[in-house]
Amino acid sequence: MQNASLASVFSTAALALATVLAAPSAHAVEYVGARFAAPATGNAVVSYGSGDAQSFDIDFGTMTRVTLAFVTFRDEAAPSMSFSALINNFTGYNFEGLNVRLTGGAVFQSPSGSVIPTFGTLAGTVVTPTQVAMSFSSGEPYALSFGNPLGEVGASDWMIDFSSVESGATFGLSVTAVPEPGTYAMLLAGLGLIGTIVRRRQR
């Protein structure tokens, strides 16, 4: 599923690439599109940044995954960009965790950026070169700042190094919303009911 989503996003990126490359760029990277995994009802992405300073509003109306695609330009000695996102929760359920993952050769730089819940309590953050996994001891019902999208004093953006990504190639950044256990239970129950209906119809 994720590879299919990435392929779709990157095919869109490829279409945008010719347009982006046609004009001179003073930046090493450009955002070219986003795709939500199904179900995508009520989900949206709005870009507020550009070039080497990327910032987004990401709205989750359903618990799913969004993948952002970026095209690189190797016109800098040390290609990197700052990244921040206000991740809004419109699902009606708490976020119990959020996972941010890089694909395509990009990696997170040290030091780590900020993770700021609005009402939830952050239990821990595990950072690897390609993933940031966040968990909550009390779920987040409203929004979380990944990096510093709101310009808060003392907060900092996440830095992403894409020096290993070839010029003109794309890399992806995905954000996955992890629902509370009760949501999983309801989802599994719903899938079980659907399976029962299908089996009865087949008979």
Identify the meaning behind each predicted range.
Residues V29-A177:
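Mature extracellular "passenger" or substrate-interacting domains of secreted, surface-exposed proteins
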Residues N3-E30, S167-I197:
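Short, threonine-centered small-residue motifs that mark membrane-proximal processing/anchoring sites
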Residues R200-R203:
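Short, charged juxtamembrane terminal tails flanking transmembrane helices
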